[in-house]
Amino acid sequence: MNPLKRRTVIAGNWKMNFTPAEATAFINEIKPMVAGKDNCDVIFCAPYVTIAAAQEAAKGSNIKIGAENVHFAEKGAYTGEVSAKMLTACGVEYVIIGHSERRQYFGETDETVNLRTKAALAAGMKVILCLGEVKEQRLSGITDEVVAMQTKLDLQSVTAEEMKNVIIAYEPVWAIGTGLTATPEQAEETCGTIRKVLASMYGEDVAESITIQYGGSMNEKNAAELLAKPNVDGGLIGGASLVAEKFTAIVDAAQ
């Protein structure tokens, strides 16, 4: 847990799971379980077709509903894509950008991640920006260099003022959906590296104010130990965000 009272953010990434009916049932189940737990923000990022149902179910609760991706253009001939303007018109405040699965399977690059980030921020959205190293980079000892370069490229031309609406999610790619988890020490070290890079870009005050999540197989068993680290300010949760009891246990660990 951070010592400077940065806002802790526990965000679920549902990925390609939950129909609208399933999302409604899940939100109705978890609403009372996380009610009153206000020491952290609780967010679920949902597939586009599920957002409206999740929003309706979450009304009156402390749960916020976000999106899992956004396109960088405001409109145009981009079949299958959704713009930040469209999302904000639907009342969506948060969006995940640059998730490792988007980079791996759909050709996202640091350049397109940067374009999407700037488009979302320009539309007034809050961005959960994902970055992290692959296994070979970790084993080669170049994790710091990789995440430093990603941070700089993904945030190119993003202003210090806009950084108020950016959350960084450090996700070691080798730990996504594998059951492997960075040790609390590895998570702390790399989140600390990201914060140092942010300080070099925006100054110490801005860097110290930014929430940095850990996102690599965080679950109900390891959350408390990870969240106890000074530079780990929350979690971006995949599999455990689909099970109300598991996600609630992570929220409890953040209290």
Feature annotation, model-predicted:
Residues 1-255:
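Active-site loop-to-helix "anion-binding N-cap" substructures in soluble metabolic enzymes
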